[in-house]
Amino acid sequence: CNNELTSVGGVCTVDLLTLPPLPKVVQGTTLRTMSPLAVDVERLPYPIPVAGAETTEVDMAYVPPLMLSYEIPDDIVLVDETPSVAWWDDDSSEWKTDGITDVSLKDRTLTYSTVKVTHHALVQSRVACAPYTRWSTRPSSTGESVIVSVTPKHERFGGRPIEIEVGEGVCALASDAEPALRSLLGVKLAPRKLLARLSKCGVHLALEDKDCAYVGIEKKDAALEAAMCE
């Protein structure tokens, strides 16, 4: 993604589809129109263009929005009091929030209005956890692995650290400070898979060099870092 937003809880794809012609009953006989729509569906653009007009000619300010509602998973950590929903723009390869209004979340049910019929997602800042207020490593109680502890800066975490036990080729969430993540507690996964699962839950720890610009820090010089580690 080319901006700082990342999806959490998965992606919802919204399509507007045509319905096949309805059957008619005439004198006890059911008549069905045979057309490609009888065995297939057709995706429509939104707003539906007037016959002979192009979609680009429609003033989106006057397009009635669609209201969508669905439940989000229980294992999502929401870092913002007001949730944000975005749609995926293929042209710019980024999540965008324009065209989405009236976002609300009640009892895990997400509701919003939109004029964008495409891929939607609940989104958060990819750098919400950065920079860390502190981090450390220590041996585990058995001495066979290492505990990596990071404390996110965001107030949502209340200064509580996220701890990951790192072993030979696998790692697992080792702290239960965040109730929404308890389903991952003690589950051994490859490092990349665990980081991906945490990111999907709303705790993004796999930051990249491009994310430095969003938190106002300079990225490491690779050559200097390598020299200092030798």
What spans do the regions from the language model cover?
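Proteolytic cleavage junctions
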Residues: 1-230
